[in-house]
Design a protein with these regions (language model features):
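Eukaryote-biased RCC1-like beta-propeller repeat architecture
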Residues: 1-217
Length: 217
């Protein structure tokens, strides 16, 4: 992200690209290695890169997503040229500005300035069994009393940090990434991570692991 809020990518990423860009990136490493500006978006303050997609947050709290054009899409049935187009999500443009964003293997998550959380994409890590998986949908009952300040996304799981330093998670915990000790466990609704350190300041999710920064007690 540049000082002007412009985003540059390189490697196998055809986000906001057109026509035969995908084929060129696959066959020409010189072209793939060159930084390319993503057209159609500025004023970006945060970008997160997942396995198949990118998500952007602007200073106004707007949220955009696009797919890289490689290895599939987040639960969507679309061809590469359509899916690599930049998409603005209107739910974050009318008094519901986002404060943080993340993308995992094939899902998206965003927290708002009001402390709420929206998820969409592949159903494994959305923390809900209702709503449209292809559109940002509010996590309602299970997180209604919590104020979430940041989010992070792993392969098929999501982590949410509240302002009192509590970590919640949802999705796969087959490798203990949600703090559970039961092999193969999955959670369709958010759970509190009982094994997390106290007074957490920040949390991040990786492929099948997680890390946190805790305040000195």
């Amino acid at each position: 992200v540049s000082e002007k809020g412009e985003v540059y990518v390189w490697g196998l990423n055809a986000c906001a690209g057109a026509g035969n860009l995908r084929d060129e990136l696959l066959t020409n490493v010189k072209s793939a290695s060159q930084p390319r500006k993503i057209l159609g978006i500025t004023d970006v303050v945060k970008v997160d890169v997942g396995y198949v997609a990118m998500i952007f947050l602007t200073s106004k709290g707007e949220v955009y997503t696009c797919y890289t054009g490689f290895d599939g899409y987040a639960g969507a049935n679309a061809d590469a040229s359509a899916s690599t187009a930049l998409q603005k999500h209107a739910v974050f443009s009318s008094g519901t500005g986002a404060s943080d964003v993340a993308t995992g293997r094939c899902h998206f998550v965003a927290s708002t300035i009001a402390g709420k959380v929206y998820t969409w994409g592949c159903p494994n890590a959305l923390g809900r069994t209702y709503g449209d998986n292809h559109e940002p949908t509010l996590l309602s009952a299970d997180m209604s009393r919590e104020f979430v300040v940041s989010v992070s996304a792993g392969e098929y799981f999501t982590l949410m940090l509240t302002r009192d330093g509590t970590i919640y998670g949802t999705g796969d915990s087959n490798s203990g990434q949600l703090g559970t000790q039961i092999a193969g466990s999955k959670f369709k609704t958010p759970i509190r991570l009982a094994s997390s350190p106290p007074r957490v300041l920040a949390v991040t999710a990786g492929y099948q692991h997680a890390a946190a920064i805790a305040r000195n007690v």
